[in-house]
Amino acid sequence: MRSAMGALLLLGSGCFAGEIPLRFAITDSWAMPMVQTEEGRPIQGIIPDVMTRLAAQVGMPAQFHVLARARLDNAMNHGEVDVRCYVTPEWVKDTGGNYLWSVPLFFQRDVLVGTASSPKVVTPATLPHQPVGTVLSYTYPTLQPLFDGGHLRRDDARSQEQVLAKLLAGRYRYAVSNQWALDWFNQRHPPDRQLRAVAVLQERGLGCYVRDDQNIPAQRILRTLLKMKTSGEIDAIIQSYTGHKESPQAGSDSP
């Protein structure tokens, strides 16, 4: 997929020379299969592949801005980027901004992760006081009451990849991850070193939102995303990385 992504990036940067770019936000804490970045730019992954295809179909060059999670809201508010994907309104602080939302395009399952020696099923509320691996600036609604009450304690890392690596290294007994990142992480380790989901924390559909600005073809972007979803194009991109079809729940309700 890396060579294909490189070709798409060249297409996006060369075929529309001189035109206004469509600026996409990429979160620096994401891990594969969502995105892999090198020298501040994405080189492969589900999200940049979808974004590049979207920009090409809209007729604009794709431009990527890799940002810290804490900077994403301000970047959208200040017009530094035009489109943000793999997101739900719950994660956006300024919900009163002039934004337009797509239908759900992706399905995310957040899981509590343990090691091969962990119990097969865990109830978070019954765990003794201990740190849990989390990603800096990420919110975890299911676990938040346990964090607030001091029952569990966040141990933040800058990326999802780092969270899982610290779990495997024994820095803590449990961590939080989405299913995609967990499956990708496990592909690089033998069975006795693989991590496993011990509890499902939350499942939800995620989409994209666009700045409602006269200089951006927002409605055309949303129509194109809908077409890409209903035609199976987005699901085919996901399957090329994950090896399995996307859950039908992703397109069932608006975010």
Language-model regions: role of each:
Residues 18-97, 134, 156, 221, ...:
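Extracytoplasmic small-molecule ligand-binding "clamshell" domains
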Residues 22-28, 101-122, 136, 208-211:
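Hydrophobic/proline-rich hinge and linker segments of small-molecule sensing/allosteric domains
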Residues 28-30, 106-111, 187-226, 244-255:
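Periplasmic-binding protein-like
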Residues 61-68, 151-166, 199:
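Short beta-strand-to-loop elements that line the ligand-binding cleft
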Residues 74, 86-96, 173-202:
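A ligand-binding cleft/hinge motif common to bilobed small-molecule-binding domains
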Residues 114-132, 218-219:
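Flexible hinge/capping segments at coil-to-helix
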